[in-house]
Amino acid sequence: MLQLSSSLEENLAALNARFGASADFYAKRIELYHCPGAIVLFDNMASLQSLWSLLLDAATRHTPSLEPERMPHTGTQVYDLLMNHSGLPAEDSPVKDMDDLIRRMTAGMAVLLLDGCKKGLVFSVQGLKSRSVEEPSGEGNLRGSREGFADLLRVNLSLLRRLIRTDTLVMETAQADCAMKTEYAICYCKDKAGKTAVARVRRTLQEAKPEVLLDSSYFVPWLFPARWRLFAPVSYTERPASAAAKLCEGKIVILVNGSPSALVLPSLFCENFDCLDDYATTAVFSSFLRVLKYGSFYLSIFLPGVFVCLAVYLPELIPPQLLFKIAAAEKATPLPLFAEMLLVIILLEIIREAGLRMPQTLGHSVSLVAALIIGDAAIGAGLLSTPVILVASITAISVFVTPSLYEPATLLRLGVTLAAGLAGPVGLVCAALGVLAALTSISAMGVPYLSGAAFSVDGVVRRNYRALSRRPFTIWQRRGS
């Protein structure tokens, strides 16, 4: 680790060797109390207007009040005067080495270097341009806050602090060991979060070495290093209100600079079917919506497989009138029912991916054209049957009821359809048992993934919010019935 030199020229030479070719590197030589100095920063990351008004103006006003015998003569004396005997808004911790200097500068801060002093004064005059606080498009709600996380870490931390106005909220910031040196934050409530879990997360993130860090989800392989896992015991949110609610339950929230997505851990399976609106409506209606979401999730996984199993292996269980229509539709298509269902499922995923990755102005058009023209043309040409299109459409709509489970639901739907088409009822039962085994085998930090999923007072069917508030809940203790 290269320590700062007492020579201003050596420090500037070291910075010029690293950033001299960069157009945004800014180094301004100044003189304070007849002592040579320099202000170093990155243009457009630090606000020059704030810098001059706060730093130099304050130093100039302080000069006439000094007696001649107290006038500083060396860089160390100037540093002590500015740090301890002036109104300059300097950070408490000075810069002592080159790595720390670069870290502060890349965070949008300005650093004052003085000749004859091995320390640098740091000023928080960030002027970073970023996306404003907006409503997240992926998490809709009818009531409650409309704010969403921004891209800057400090802005996101302030949004959480504004909601949780207690001394129990702790926000630890650190720098990731990656090429980008991205800053991240670990947030938790010290009176609710498990101390062992917090220490484990802190240690894991310190030891993690991602090549790049662009989002909080990049930490998941280090936090839960299982090679094959369909369900991850974590959740994501872009709403400060949701993150604050999770913090009050004793959970840990991880934020990464440059990403509006917050990683929440540990997470339960039943929480994929909750939303903020559940607690703003009556218990009866929110319970109905939760039952609807559970049904939609299992429908999105098993409906194509059950349809293939019944139509191919157990046609006697289908009502005769419906069976005759399915058989008539299948006679007009060249593919067997099993292959036809797989083709439609894959085709719907292609359409979804195209609509998602296309520019927003074209994405809706692509989805509409694919749904109307391609689907109608496929049926008219006899490539696909109407019952298969209907089943696949119901499945595609059902999976969007629980968007946080879209990835595992898509893979499980393909797996269940393959098992039902190749092995019939036996394959369908084995696939269902496999899904159940996958869910029951997951735990995060000692908390089972299915903890309290069905029989909790805030599970599939919940009590009214007044009754829930009588028993404060944290993730580390199961709320009794």
Q: Language-model features: where?
A:
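Membrane-embedded alpha-helical signal segments
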Residues: 1-302, 316, 320, 440-481
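Transmembrane alpha-helical segments that form the functional core of multipass membrane systems
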Residues: 254, 267-415
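Hydrophobic alpha-helical transmembrane segments of membrane transport and translocation systems
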Residues: 386-388, 392-481
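Amphipathic alpha-helical protein-protein interaction surfaces
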Residues: 165, 331, 424-425
